Amino acid sequence: MEQLITPQKYVNPMIDVAFKYLFGTERNKHLLKGLLENVFKRKINDIIYDNTVQIGDTLESRSACFDVVCKSVDGPDFIVECQVRSQKYFAERAVFYSSRAITNQAPKGDWDYNFKPVYFLGLIDFALPESVGKSEGHVQSYSLRNDDNSTLMTDRVRYVFMEVEPFDKSYDECTNFEEKFLYYMKNLPTFADKPDTHNDKYFEELLMEAEYLKMDTETQAQYERRVKEMRDAKNVEEYARKKAIAEGREEGVALALKALSLLKEGRSVQEVCKETGLPEDKVRALAN
């Protein structure tokens, strides 16, 4: 019999089922709208979800990188992506998918390239590499600017990345909306009781909707399955690491972890064998 997950008071919003429930449903549209307004510093009259767009290319990749796509009725299109595992080219991925959102606006025939703005928000469970020109803090904002004088070339494309897991401030140390949002995104699952939000309406509503018991039975079951899958995957990864170390193969640790990462990205067993040099039986054992 499958062991049930003991629910916490609040769900983990970085798990895809919970994230979509909190920010990707009509019921909680106000939470996404408030997030986008505060992050991109602009008033949004209303948003419309675009469920026809799927960022992830495979089931495996969507479990690690999932998205909410929406359009504002009077302004930009938004891509909100949540990445729970480090990815080497995540910044480039953001540029690629925002570019796709732009080209999808092109009509058949003549076009003057007057496209709607596309804003990308990435919530990530890791730190961006220093190579992307990071500033201090855990909220990184990028736009297209002149290299010499930083004059804005166009406001039609913007990228904001919010580092959830590396965020280490207490609530009292938070000085703005973005930091408070990161605080709750990271710490929600650890709260046994409702924390003091200092009467902040947005976070009062976020906490209310993030209660596990607030979910319907079907969503609770989906959430529990995802928690179990993530725990199982973590255990497999740890087992592969310990087994390789026990056998005295440091190189084996790296290869096993690389193989696991490729499998989780949706790569076939044959592709993983070719890229890592591991035998097929070893790769299949990691996949099961």
What is each model feature region?
Residues 1-220:
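Conserved single-residue anchors adjacent to enzymatic active/cofactor-binding motifs
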Residues 2-8, 78-83, 183-288:
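Short, charged alpha-helical interaction segments and adjacent helix-coil junctions
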